[in-house]
A protein has these predicted regions:
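Catalytic machinery of carbohydrate-active enzymes
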Residues: 1-318
Protein backbone atom coordinates (compact mmCIF):
# COMPACT_ATOMS: atom_id res chain seq x y z
CA UNK A 1 0.00 0.00 0.00
CA UNK A 2 1.35 3.41 -1.01
CA UNK A 3 -0.27 6.54 0.42
CA UNK A 4 0.41 10.18 -0.46
CA UNK A 5 -0.74 13.01 1.82
CA UNK A 6 -0.80 16.60 0.54
CA UNK A 7 -0.61 18.85 3.60
CA UNK A 8 0.96 22.30 3.84
CA UNK A 9 1.14 24.81 6.66
CA UNK A 10 3.44 25.70 9.53
CA UNK A 11 4.68 23.63 12.46
CA UNK A 12 1.46 23.62 14.46
CA UNK A 13 -0.57 22.83 11.34
CA UNK A 14 1.44 19.66 10.86
CA UNK A 15 1.19 18.58 14.49
CA UNK A 16 -2.62 18.83 14.51
CA UNK A 17 -2.62 16.50 11.47
CA UNK A 18 -0.87 13.72 13.42
CA UNK A 19 -4.08 12.05 14.65
CA UNK A 20 -5.19 11.65 11.03
CA UNK A 21 -1.79 10.27 10.03
CA UNK A 22 -2.01 7.94 13.01
CA UNK A 23 -5.35 6.62 11.77
CA UNK A 24 -3.78 5.82 8.40
CA UNK A 25 -0.84 4.06 10.05
CA UNK A 26 -3.09 2.06 12.37
CA UNK A 27 -5.26 0.89 9.46
CA UNK A 28 -2.30 0.12 7.20
CA UNK A 29 0.66 -0.53 9.55
CA UNK A 30 2.97 -1.66 6.74
CA UNK A 31 1.99 1.02 4.22
CA UNK A 32 4.54 3.33 2.64
CA UNK A 33 3.30 6.83 3.52
CA UNK A 34 4.72 9.97 1.92
CA UNK A 35 3.81 13.61 2.52
CA UNK A 36 4.22 16.71 0.37
CA UNK A 37 4.28 19.83 2.51
CA UNK A 38 6.53 21.74 4.87
CA UNK A 39 9.63 19.55 5.30
CA UNK A 40 10.94 21.31 8.41
CA UNK A 41 7.65 20.56 10.19
CA UNK A 42 7.02 17.13 8.68
CA UNK A 43 10.40 15.81 9.85
CA UNK A 44 8.65 15.38 13.21
CA UNK A 45 6.82 12.41 11.71
CA UNK A 46 9.56 11.12 9.40
CA UNK A 47 10.77 7.66 10.46
CA UNK A 48 9.04 8.29 13.78
CA UNK A 49 5.96 6.14 13.26
CA UNK A 50 4.02 8.29 10.80
CA UNK A 51 5.88 9.01 7.55
CA UNK A 52 8.39 7.21 5.35
CA UNK A 53 9.27 10.11 3.04
CA UNK A 54 8.70 13.87 2.86
CA UNK A 55 8.72 16.16 -0.19
CA UNK A 56 8.94 19.99 -0.09
CA UNK A 57 5.71 21.29 -1.60
CA UNK A 58 7.53 24.28 -3.09
CA UNK A 59 9.49 22.09 -5.49
CA UNK A 60 8.62 23.15 -9.04
CA UNK A 61 7.01 19.83 -9.95
CA UNK A 62 4.18 20.29 -7.45
CA UNK A 63 3.10 23.50 -9.18
CA UNK A 64 1.97 21.32 -12.08
CA UNK A 65 -0.97 20.04 -10.05
CA UNK A 66 -4.05 22.06 -10.90
CA UNK A 67 -2.14 24.28 -13.34
CA UNK A 68 -3.59 25.67 -16.56
CA UNK A 69 -2.09 25.17 -20.00
CA UNK A 70 0.72 25.20 -21.04
CA UNK A 71 1.86 24.06 -17.56
CA UNK A 72 -0.89 21.51 -17.00
CA UNK A 73 0.06 18.00 -15.88
CA UNK A 74 0.47 15.49 -18.72
CA UNK A 75 -0.35 11.81 -18.26
CA UNK A 76 2.83 10.72 -20.04
CA UNK A 77 5.34 12.66 -17.92
CA UNK A 78 7.46 10.98 -15.18
CA UNK A 79 5.90 13.04 -12.37
CA UNK A 80 2.43 11.87 -13.39
CA UNK A 81 3.62 8.27 -13.53
CA UNK A 82 5.03 8.61 -10.03
CA UNK A 83 1.76 10.06 -8.70
CA UNK A 84 -0.13 7.20 -10.33
CA UNK A 85 1.98 4.70 -8.36
CA UNK A 86 0.06 5.59 -5.19
CA UNK A 87 -3.12 3.75 -4.25
CA UNK A 88 -4.50 6.42 -1.91
CA UNK A 89 -4.08 10.20 -2.00
CA UNK A 90 -5.36 12.45 0.81
CA UNK A 91 -5.48 16.11 -0.20
CA UNK A 92 -5.51 18.86 2.43
CA UNK A 93 -4.17 21.49 0.03
CA UNK A 94 -6.61 24.24 -1.01
CA UNK A 95 -8.47 23.19 -4.16
CA UNK A 96 -11.35 25.69 -4.52
CA UNK A 97 -12.05 24.95 -8.18
CA UNK A 98 -11.34 21.22 -8.06
CA UNK A 99 -8.33 21.48 -10.35
CA UNK A 100 -6.16 19.17 -8.23
CA UNK A 101 -8.97 16.63 -8.05
CA UNK A 102 -9.30 16.91 -11.83
CA UNK A 103 -5.65 16.05 -12.36
CA UNK A 104 -5.82 13.01 -10.11
CA UNK A 105 -9.01 11.95 -11.85
CA UNK A 106 -7.09 12.10 -15.13
CA UNK A 107 -4.60 9.67 -13.57
CA UNK A 108 -7.36 7.20 -12.70
CA UNK A 109 -8.08 8.20 -9.10
CA UNK A 110 -11.72 7.96 -8.01
CA UNK A 111 -13.65 7.99 -4.76
CA UNK A 112 -13.28 4.22 -4.53
CA UNK A 113 -11.51 1.37 -6.28
CA UNK A 114 -7.83 0.62 -6.79
CA UNK A 115 -6.83 4.29 -6.80
CA UNK A 116 -8.64 6.52 -4.32
CA UNK A 117 -8.48 10.31 -4.07
CA UNK A 118 -9.94 12.06 -1.02
CA UNK A 119 -10.01 15.85 -0.73
CA UNK A 120 -10.85 17.89 2.36
CA UNK A 121 -10.90 21.65 3.09
CA UNK A 122 -7.55 23.05 4.18
CA UNK A 123 -9.11 25.37 6.77
CA UNK A 124 -10.56 23.60 9.83
CA UNK A 125 -14.27 24.07 10.47
CA UNK A 126 -14.62 21.41 13.19
CA UNK A 127 -13.08 21.86 16.65
CA UNK A 128 -10.54 20.83 17.67
CA UNK A 129 -8.55 21.26 14.46
CA UNK A 130 -7.34 17.65 14.61
CA UNK A 131 -10.95 16.46 14.38
CA UNK A 132 -11.33 18.30 11.08
CA UNK A 133 -8.41 16.47 9.51
CA UNK A 134 -9.56 13.11 10.85
CA UNK A 135 -13.00 13.72 9.33
CA UNK A 136 -11.43 13.48 5.86
CA UNK A 137 -10.81 9.79 6.49
CA UNK A 138 -14.39 8.88 7.41
CA UNK A 139 -15.23 7.84 3.80
CA UNK A 140 -12.46 5.25 4.17
CA UNK A 141 -14.15 3.83 7.27
CA UNK A 142 -11.61 5.42 9.63
CA UNK A 143 -12.83 7.31 12.69
CA UNK A 144 -11.66 8.23 16.18
CA UNK A 145 -12.64 10.27 19.22
CA UNK A 146 -9.01 10.67 20.27
CA UNK A 147 -7.71 13.93 18.85
CA UNK A 148 -4.56 14.27 20.96
CA UNK A 149 -1.38 14.46 18.88
CA UNK A 150 1.50 12.23 19.95
CA UNK A 151 5.16 12.46 19.05
CA UNK A 152 7.81 9.80 19.56
CA UNK A 153 11.36 11.20 19.82
CA UNK A 154 14.12 8.81 18.81
CA UNK A 155 17.17 7.92 20.87
CA UNK A 156 19.17 10.33 18.70
CA UNK A 157 16.64 13.10 19.38
CA UNK A 158 16.93 12.49 23.12
CA UNK A 159 20.71 12.44 23.00
CA UNK A 160 20.71 15.78 21.19
CA UNK A 161 18.30 17.23 23.75
CA UNK A 162 20.44 16.01 26.64
CA UNK A 163 23.51 17.59 25.07
CA UNK A 164 21.69 20.90 24.62
CA UNK A 165 20.60 20.95 28.25
CA UNK A 166 23.83 19.43 29.58
CA UNK A 167 21.82 16.88 31.54
CA UNK A 168 20.40 13.44 31.00
CA UNK A 169 17.16 14.12 32.85
CA UNK A 170 15.62 16.41 35.40
CA UNK A 171 12.73 18.77 35.81
CA UNK A 172 12.64 21.91 33.74
CA UNK A 173 10.14 24.64 32.94
CA UNK A 174 10.09 25.65 29.27
CA UNK A 175 9.07 29.12 28.16
CA UNK A 176 8.54 30.20 24.56
CA UNK A 177 8.02 34.00 24.73
CA UNK A 178 6.96 34.60 21.12
CA UNK A 179 4.18 33.59 18.78
CA UNK A 180 5.06 35.11 15.41
CA UNK A 181 2.26 37.66 15.78
CA UNK A 182 2.15 40.63 18.21
CA UNK A 183 -1.60 40.23 18.67
CA UNK A 184 -1.11 36.66 19.95
CA UNK A 185 1.82 37.44 22.25
CA UNK A 186 1.42 38.14 25.97
CA UNK A 187 3.82 40.88 27.17
CA UNK A 188 7.29 39.61 28.03
CA UNK A 189 7.33 41.55 31.30
CA UNK A 190 4.21 39.73 32.47
CA UNK A 191 5.82 36.40 31.69
CA UNK A 192 8.89 37.45 33.64
CA UNK A 193 6.69 38.30 36.63
CA UNK A 194 5.21 34.79 36.48
CA UNK A 195 8.61 33.16 36.07
CA UNK A 196 10.12 34.99 39.04
CA UNK A 197 7.30 33.74 41.27
CA UNK A 198 7.68 30.18 39.99
CA UNK A 199 11.44 30.32 40.49
CA UNK A 200 10.90 31.27 44.12
CA UNK A 201 8.47 28.37 44.55
CA UNK A 202 10.57 25.76 42.73
CA UNK A 203 14.24 26.49 43.25
CA UNK A 204 15.23 23.04 41.97
CA UNK A 205 13.74 23.54 38.50
CA UNK A 206 15.70 24.92 35.59
CA UNK A 207 14.12 27.45 33.21
CA UNK A 208 14.60 26.68 29.51
CA UNK A 209 13.87 29.64 27.23
CA UNK A 210 13.04 28.61 23.65
CA UNK A 211 13.70 31.28 21.04
CA UNK A 212 12.58 31.12 17.42
CA UNK A 213 13.32 33.53 14.60
CA UNK A 214 10.65 35.93 15.86
CA UNK A 215 12.36 36.13 19.27
CA UNK A 216 16.01 36.21 18.15
CA UNK A 217 16.39 39.79 19.41
CA UNK A 218 15.74 38.63 22.97
CA UNK A 219 18.83 36.41 22.96
CA UNK A 220 21.07 39.45 22.74
CA UNK A 221 19.05 41.55 25.17
CA UNK A 222 21.26 41.65 28.25
CA UNK A 223 18.62 43.47 30.31
CA UNK A 224 16.15 40.65 29.74
CA UNK A 225 18.82 38.10 30.63
CA UNK A 226 19.34 39.85 33.96
CA UNK A 227 15.62 39.43 34.67
CA UNK A 228 15.80 35.63 34.29
CA UNK A 229 16.43 33.20 37.16
CA UNK A 230 20.02 32.10 37.76
CA UNK A 231 19.37 28.54 36.55
CA UNK A 232 18.30 29.48 33.03
CA UNK A 233 19.28 27.93 29.70
CA UNK A 234 18.49 29.89 26.52
CA UNK A 235 18.12 27.77 23.37
CA UNK A 236 17.69 28.97 19.80
CA UNK A 237 17.63 27.26 16.43
CA UNK A 238 16.86 23.69 17.50
CA UNK A 239 15.02 21.56 14.91
CA UNK A 240 11.49 20.45 15.82
CA UNK A 241 12.45 16.86 16.59
CA UNK A 242 15.05 18.00 19.14
CA UNK A 243 12.53 20.42 20.65
CA UNK A 244 10.20 17.47 21.17
CA UNK A 245 12.89 15.63 23.12
CA UNK A 246 13.72 18.78 25.10
CA UNK A 247 10.07 19.18 26.10
CA UNK A 248 10.06 15.56 27.30
CA UNK A 249 12.49 16.75 29.99
CA UNK A 250 10.14 19.55 31.05
CA UNK A 251 7.32 19.41 33.56
CA UNK A 252 5.68 22.61 32.27
CA UNK A 253 5.52 24.63 29.05
CA UNK A 254 4.57 28.32 29.13
CA UNK A 255 3.58 30.02 25.89
CA UNK A 256 0.93 30.87 23.34
CA UNK A 257 -0.85 29.44 20.30
CA UNK A 258 2.32 28.22 18.58
CA UNK A 259 3.95 25.23 16.96
CA UNK A 260 6.26 24.63 19.95
CA UNK A 261 3.20 24.53 22.22
CA UNK A 262 1.70 21.76 20.09
CA UNK A 263 5.00 19.88 20.16
CA UNK A 264 5.19 20.16 23.96
CA UNK A 265 1.66 18.85 24.37
CA UNK A 266 2.36 15.98 21.95
CA UNK A 267 5.14 14.61 24.19
CA UNK A 268 2.99 14.86 27.32
CA UNK A 269 4.32 18.11 28.77
CA UNK A 270 1.74 20.09 30.74
CA UNK A 271 1.03 23.45 29.12
CA UNK A 272 -0.23 26.85 30.24
CA UNK A 273 -1.08 28.81 27.10
CA UNK A 274 -2.28 32.40 26.80
CA UNK A 275 -4.67 32.95 23.88
CA UNK A 276 -5.96 36.12 22.24
CA UNK A 277 -7.51 36.35 18.76
CA UNK A 278 -7.41 32.61 18.03
CA UNK A 279 -10.01 30.29 19.55
CA UNK A 280 -8.56 27.71 21.96
CA UNK A 281 -11.51 25.41 21.27
CA UNK A 282 -10.10 25.09 17.75
CA UNK A 283 -6.37 25.62 18.20
CA UNK A 284 -5.37 24.65 21.74
CA UNK A 285 -3.97 21.12 21.94
CA UNK A 286 -6.69 18.87 23.37
CA UNK A 287 -5.91 16.94 26.52
CA UNK A 288 -6.21 17.07 30.31
CA UNK A 289 -2.75 18.60 30.80
CA UNK A 290 -3.54 21.73 28.77
CA UNK A 291 -4.76 24.99 30.34
CA UNK A 292 -5.68 27.63 27.75
CA UNK A 293 -6.42 31.08 29.18
CA UNK A 294 -8.37 33.63 27.15
CA UNK A 295 -10.64 36.64 27.60
CA UNK A 296 -11.73 37.53 24.08
CA UNK A 297 -9.46 38.75 21.31
CA UNK A 298 -7.16 40.90 23.46
CA UNK A 299 -4.33 38.76 24.75
CA UNK A 300 -3.45 41.50 27.26
CA UNK A 301 -6.75 40.90 29.08
CA UNK A 302 -5.31 37.75 30.66
CA UNK A 303 -3.79 38.66 34.03
CA UNK A 304 -0.55 37.65 35.73
CA UNK A 305 -2.38 36.09 38.73
CA UNK A 306 -4.41 33.88 36.36
CA UNK A 307 -1.34 32.57 34.56
CA UNK A 308 0.58 32.10 37.81
CA UNK A 309 -2.29 30.16 39.37
CA UNK A 310 -2.56 27.91 36.30
CA UNK A 311 1.19 27.25 36.33
CA UNK A 312 1.14 26.40 40.03
CA UNK A 313 -1.75 23.99 39.46
CA UNK A 314 0.19 22.29 36.68
CA UNK A 315 3.38 22.00 38.73
CA UNK A 316 1.46 20.78 41.74
CA UNK A 317 0.10 17.90 39.67
CA UNK A 318 3.49 16.84 38.35
Amino acid sequence: MKILVLRGGALGDFVVTLPALGLLRKRWPHAWIELAGNPSAARLGLCRGYLDAVHPQHEARWSRLGADQPYALRVDEPFASWLASFELVINYWPDPDGAIARDFGMLGFLGSGSRIFVSHPAKPVTAPAAAHFCEALRPLGLATNDFESRLFPTAADRAAAGARLSLAGGRCIAWHPGSGSPGKTWPVQRWLNVIRELAADHLERRLVVILGQAEAHLEANEKRKDDLPAHTTVLAGDPPEVLAAIFELCSLFLGHDTGPAHIAAAVGCRCVLVFGPTDPAMWAPPGPGIQALRHGDRVDDVSVPEVLAAARRALGEH
